[in-house]
Amino acid sequence: PSDGIKRRTFLQTGGGAGLAAWAAPMLVMSRVWGANDTIGVGVIGPGRRGQQLMGDFNRLKGFQYVAVSDVNARRMDQVAVGKDWKKCQDFRALLELKEVDAVIVATPDHWHALNSIYACMAGKDVYVEKPMTLTIAEGRAMVNAARHYNCVVQCGSQQRSDARCRTGCEWVRNQRAGKVTV
């Protein structure tokens, strides 16, 4: 076993400081990374949430950001200032980069499925921000792509594993919070 992080472990423990990952089942590795291997990560959509996720992932070892993609060139330049990252306005160009092993998808919601499916088709593992998809059909297409291309796809759902959120849900369900109306 190596002291370095494994690509799939990276995805399972990423985002929100990895809170959701501890509750998630461990996935089987198809490739073990050696001690000198580094996971190259590309970020698709480095807006406010994308930058938060980048900060969360920075707590992990054994990876480095290698590329960033955003249709807003100014934002992309701001995020990559002083960094030796490739910049791609078209996310498909980022997916073609050999140095990218995995991607963080933090684009507007309606892009999540397409970005993730294309990433799987390119052989990249995916951490996608919620909502994972907007329709059942998109969800099925993502599952099919992940299975067909043997990729790990994890959807961020940190609030679902946060004790404060669970407690709040219990209060509402047990009517301890009073009658809740919308």
Would you name each region that the model predicts?
Residues 1-128, 137-152:
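N-terminal glycine-/serine-/threonine-rich beta1-alpha1-beta2 phosphate-ribose binding loop
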Residues 125, 133-182:
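A contiguous active-site-proximal alpha/beta segment in oxidoreductase catalytic domains
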